[in-house]
Every structure is written in C-alpha cells, then in structure tokens.
Amino acid sequence: MNSHFASAHTPFYINTKEGRYLVLKAVKVCDVRTVEFEGSKASCVLKVDKPSSPASERRPSSPSRCERMNNPGKQVPFMRTDMLQNMFAANRDNVASRLLS
C-alpha cells in the first residue's frame, strides 16, 4: 500500500448541520496541505441530496408471515439422489468391460 494512503477506522458517524451521517468506507489521506477558507467566500460546495421521504417510508415492509403457494394435490418433483452414483457405476462397468475384452 502506498505510504500516503491508509484506511480510516470505519464505520463512523459525522455530525453536520443537516444531521448525522454514517460513513461506511473512508480513506485517510496523509501529507496533503489544508487550505483555509471562509464559508461565505467558498467556491466549492458539497451538495447533499436529502431523501424525499423519511427512511421508515422507504424501507420495504417485512412480510408478516411466510407465504407459500400450497397445492395439496400437487407434489414437488425431486431429483433422483442416486443419479450421480449410477453414473459412476455405469462408467466403471464400461471401463471394466473394455479392459476385459
């Protein structure tokens, strides 16, 4: 890893005027100069788009119970469990018959 970059301890919170933000991944940059500025004269502004609805409204609702499509007369087809074993046995028998003939 480059000596100028290091992973910051994540996750962590940042408190701002707009609210509290959870930072999941961050990179700590070393040896970079800091430029002092006044907020009223700043030419670069970080824009944060606020969500249009509260988080509780955006979250999908959890199902209250497990829903199944049960058809009592219809059984679920299962794959034969001995298929792989039969395939190896047939291969073994074919090889043995070729060797003996």
Swiss-Prot record:
Keyword annotations from UniProtKB, A to Z: DNA-binding, Host-virus interaction, Inhibition of host innate immune response by virus, Late protein, Phosphoprotein, Viral immunoevasion, Virion
Bias-annotated ranges (Basic and acidic residues): 56-68
Subunit structure: Self-associates to form high molecular-weight forms. Interacts with protein OPG157. Interacts with host RICTOR and RPTOR; these interactions disrupt the mTORC1 and mTORC2 crosstalk.
Protein encoded by which gene: OPG062
Protein name: Phosphoprotein OPG062
Function noted in UniProt: Plays an essential role in virion assembly and morphogenesis. Also plays a role in the inhibition of host immune response by dysregulating mTOR. Sequesters host RICTOR and RPTOR, thereby disrupting mTORC1 and mTORC2 crosstalk. In turn, blocks the host antiviral response in part through mTOR-dependent degradation of cGAS, the primary poxvirus sensor.
TM region positions: none
UniProt subcellular location: Virion
Post-translational modification: Phosphorylated on two serines. While these phosphorylations do not play a role in virion assembly; they are essential for the interaction with host RICTOR and RPTOR.
Main location: virion
One GO term describing the cellular component: virion component
Modified residues (Phosphoserine): 53, 62
Biological process, per Gene Ontology: symbiont-mediated suppression of host innate immune response; viral protein processing
Similarity-based family: Belongs to the orthopoxvirus OPG062 family.
InterPro entries with a match to the protein in the record: Phosphoprotein_F17 (IPR006854)
Single Gene Ontology MF annotation: DNA binding
Annotated segments matching region Disordered: 48-76
